[in-house]
Amino acid sequence: MLEEKNVKSRYVVRLFFSTLLVGGVSAAILGFIIRWSEFEPYFTDFDILKILSTLFWLFGVGLIFSVVSQMGFFAYLTVHRFGLGIFRSLWNGVQIVLILFVLFDVVYFRHRAFGGDLSPYIIDALVLTVVALVVSYIKAKQTNKEAFIPAIFFMVVVTVIEWVPAVRVNDDSWVHLMLFPLLICNAYQLLILHKLNQKSEQEKKPSK
C-alpha cells in the first residue's frame, strides 16, 4: 500500500520544495516544446529578453501545477486511509472500478462535450494509462506488490481530477502543458515518498 507513516517535518519540506522544482523545470522545458509554433520566432530572432521572460513565465506556471499536484497527493493519502478503513479488502476493487470509469470519462464525456475527432481523447487516455502502469510497476518493485493498484489509482484518477481546469478550457496547448507536468510531479512524489519514510524511520531508531 501507499506509505502513510509520520515523516519528519524537514523531509516534508524537502518534498515540497523538490516537487516545486520538478514542476517548474518540467513545465519550462515542455512548454517550449508543446507551444513551439508560438515561441519559435523568439529563437529564430534570437530575442533573449522574450526567451527569458517566457522561460520564467512557464516556470511560474509549473510551480502552480506542482502545488496542485501536491494538494492532490496528500488528499489521496487521506482518502486511501479512509478507503482502507471503510472498504477493507474491497478497496482495491473499488479503485479498479473508479480507474476504469475515469479513463472512460476522459474519452467519452470529453468527446461528447467538445466533439471533434475521437483519436486525441483516446491518445490522452492511453498516455495516462501507460505512464500510470510504468510508474506503478516501479513503485511495486521498490516497495511491495500491494502498492500497485493504489499507485495506478493515484496516477490516473487523482491526475485527472487535478487536470480538470485545463480540460474544461479544451485548448490543446494548455491541456498538454498541464497534463505532463502533473504526471511528472505525481510520479516523482509517488516514487520518492517511501525513500523519505525510510530515512525518517532510520533517524527515529536510537543510536547504539
Predicted regions and their residues:
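Alpha-helical transmembrane segments of multi-pass membrane proteins
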Residues: 21-39, 160-164
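Membrane-proximal helix-loop-helix units in multi-pass membrane proteins
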Residues: 96-150
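Membrane-interface helix-boundary motifs at transmembrane edges
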Residues: 80-92, 139-146
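Membrane-helix interface and helix-disruption motif detector
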Residues: 57-59, 111-122, 166-177
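Selected alpha-helical membrane-embedding segments in polytopic membrane proteins
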Residues: 29-88
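Alpha-helical transmembrane segments and their helix-start/interface "positive-inside/aromatic belt" motifs
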Residues: 4-22, 173-175
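Transmembrane alpha-helical segments of multi-pass membrane proteins
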Residues: 76, 88-104, 151-157
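Terminal transmembrane helical module of multi-pass membrane proteins
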Residues: 136-208
